[in-house]
Amino acid sequence: MFIQPTHTISITFDKENLSAKIYRNTGKSTSKITSINGNSKIQLSDGKYIIKTSSKSGSINENSTEFAVKGSDENISIKTEYSQKFMSSKINEYRSDISGVLFAKYPELKSSFILQKEIILGNNADWYAASYQRGVIDRNSGDTYTVILKKENNKWVIKTKPQIINTIYNTKDIPEDILSETTSRLSPFSTNS
């Protein structure tokens, strides 16, 4: 009798309180292997697998990640996105605090600009980004201005002035993954907000 060797697979989620089901994918069919809660280490033999991630609270969009085990241990990082329902809930919860901080420093945003999109980011829903476009005036270029805030010590702090382009060079103290996700999700061409 031949026993297939197994390898340690370390699965790490980018957010807390997530669970997942692991399926073996033979190409012809998939069969459930196990379920996990939170970051886990499991033993798997060589083959192709699918991890289907979810949250009991509905805070993330369900996510499928495919990976293969080929003769060695593997580290699998699972990146998830907040669900629209969760983001809407958090934005509504934070709106008055964010607006107070933002419009106190940049009153022209309230009077001369129109909010286009807003999102919640970060592993702990502690980043906020919004895009604004100048209201209807003769010189409206159509440019979109983005502003980013972070919740620090239970207070929202402005991390960027409203500007057209945010990069690692013209912003400080903003992780590259937050900048990248802000740019892709607030783009006027983005289908996921």
Q: Model segments located where?
A:
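A glycine-anchored, Pro-Gly-centered beta-turn/N-cap motif
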Residues: 38, 45-48, 152-154
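A short, solvent-exposed beta-strand micro-motif common in secreted/extracellular proteins
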Residues: 44-57
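Low-complexity, intrinsically disordered terminal/linker segments enriched in charged
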Residues: 79-107, 123, 127-129, 161-193
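Structured interaction patches on ligand/partner-binding surfaces of diverse proteins
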Residues: 32-36, 56-83
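Exposed beta-strand-loop-beta-strand "reactive/processing" segments of non-cytosolic proteins
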Residues: 51, 116-149
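Short, acidic Ser/Thr/Gly-rich low-complexity loop/linker segments typical of extracellular
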Residues: 21-39
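Short proline/glycine-enriched turn/loop motifs at strand-loop junctions of beta-rich domains
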Residues: 4-8, 12-20
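Short beta-strand edge/turn micro-motifs at domain boundaries
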Residues: 75-77, 147-169
